[in-house]
């Protein structure tokens, strides 16, 4: 299997699409081991037909529907009303928007790119440095990796057979902590660069309440999701169907902004996104079969335990590895490929599976904004028309915040487990 893994990385470095890199490396494993090709076909089909995995395309469609029905601009108006009196207030809007959008987009890269396109021109007009703007818009998108319904957490929970409901609850503490610390970092750096508040005093309570009521349907969505899953009214997969119906209802009945034209365009965009994910899912089943067949998890566990038996040090080593992987691959791909490898190892050294899921998805999402090759780093820098060096140089306080949150989850796991244990029991 190690040869197949090597082939995967070679194809990846040659620029082959991730889905086909996974598929061809899995095919090479079957060829090397002289296994029946019927198993390869069966694994591809059975993985893509998983009922639990159905949540992924449903949430992708729901996220696209919500973005088309006017929720984004209403959330931005509410965030701006709350932060207009703060230093670097458009940067503060970015942090608050990511927290509110966690239940809408589910994708950190999509959230970062969207916020750069929406907030970037206004930041430039107000004289904000382009690199600083790119950094905060990109790194605030990491909040989406923790706030439900994160796509990465759904995949991790499905592949690793971990409670998705507990993962969703666990995301709130690190997600809100990340938001608060990023807002403090924005205040500090905005004072340093002279980015003054847009208003001299906080907005009137009436204005904030008006903006809140206008965006209440978006804010209620993740809360309803958690409640419905917690009380067994619906499974995580069924909640994806609820999310689509909810988005259609909000867009047509309450906001009146979802037209036939925008609905058709949303369906087209969703089909493109879902097709890519489905191909990756199908081929990852073949790849995962090879991991189980060759007992790779035991080999890696023994190798890691040969270095040290200290669980904290082992977890730090795994975090560094995940960060490097995140620079090169999409978070969904990493969750599909590495969860069956790393999760048994973490369980064997006593690391809680829910805590590891939060650490894993935050770290790999951080990787997409980490130089030298983070995909989201290039995306936001390109949108803001600045070199990636400038983004990293001006955004170092925000990078330190994310590192701090990851270390917090490693050394204070009970804080991450507080809400899941409170809601579901220890």
What are these model-predicted stretches?
Residues 1-426:
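Alpha-helical transmembrane segments of multi-pass membrane transport proteins
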């Amino acid at each position: 299997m190690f040869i197949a893994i090597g082939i995967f990385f070679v194809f990846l470095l040659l620029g082959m699409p991730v889905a086909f890199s996974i598929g061809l490396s899995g095919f090479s494993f079957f060829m090397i081991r002289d296994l029946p090709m019927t198993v390869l076909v069966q694994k591809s089909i059975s993985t893509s037909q998983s009922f639990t995995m159905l949540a992924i395309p449903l949430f992708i469609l729901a996220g696209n529907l919500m973005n088309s029905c006017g929720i984004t601009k209403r959330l931005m108006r509410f965030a701006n009303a709350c932060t207009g009196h703060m230093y670097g207030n458009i940067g503060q809007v970015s942090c608050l928007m990511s927290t509110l959008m966690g239940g809408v987009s589910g994708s950190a890269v999509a959230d970062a790119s969207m916020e750069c396109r929406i907030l970037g021109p206004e930041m430039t007009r107000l004289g904000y440095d382009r690199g600083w703007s790119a950094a905060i818009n990109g790194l605030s998108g990491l909040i989406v990796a923790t706030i439900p319904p994160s796509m990465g957490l759904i995949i991790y929970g499905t592949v690793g057979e971990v409670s998705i409901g507990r993962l969703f609850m666990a995301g709130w503490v690190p997600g809100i902590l990340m938001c608060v610390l990023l807002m403090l970092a924005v205040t500090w750096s905005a004072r340093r660069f002279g980015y003054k508040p847009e208003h001299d005093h906080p907005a009137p309570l009436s204005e904030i309440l008006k903006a809140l009521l206008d965006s209440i349907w978006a804010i209620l969505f993740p809360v309803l999701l958690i409640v419905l899953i917690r009380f067994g009214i619906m499974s995580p997969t069924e909640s994806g169907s609820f999310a689509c119906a909810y988005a259609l209802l909000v867009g047509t009945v309450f906001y009146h902004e979802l037209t036939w034209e925008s609905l058709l365009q949303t369906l087209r965009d969703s089909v493109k996104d879902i097709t890519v994910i489905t191909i990756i899912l199908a081929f990852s089943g073949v790849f995962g079969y090879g991991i189980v067949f060759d007992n790779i998890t035991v080999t890696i566990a023994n190798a890691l335990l040969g270095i040290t038996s200290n669980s904290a040090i082992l977890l730090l080593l795994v975090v560094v590895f995940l960060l490097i992987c995140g620079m090169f691959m999409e978070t969904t791909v990493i969750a599909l490929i590495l969860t069956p490898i790393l999760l048994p190892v973490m369980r064997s050294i006593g690391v809680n599976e829910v805590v590891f899921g939060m650490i894993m998805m935050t770290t790999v999402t951080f990787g997409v904004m980490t130089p030298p090759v983070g995909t989201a780093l290039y995306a936001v820098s390109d949108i803001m028309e600045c070199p990636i060096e400038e983004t990293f140089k001006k955004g170092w306080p925000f990078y330190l915040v994310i590192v701090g949150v990851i270390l917090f989850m490693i050394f204070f796991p009970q804080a991450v487990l507080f809400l899941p244990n409170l809601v579901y029991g220890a």
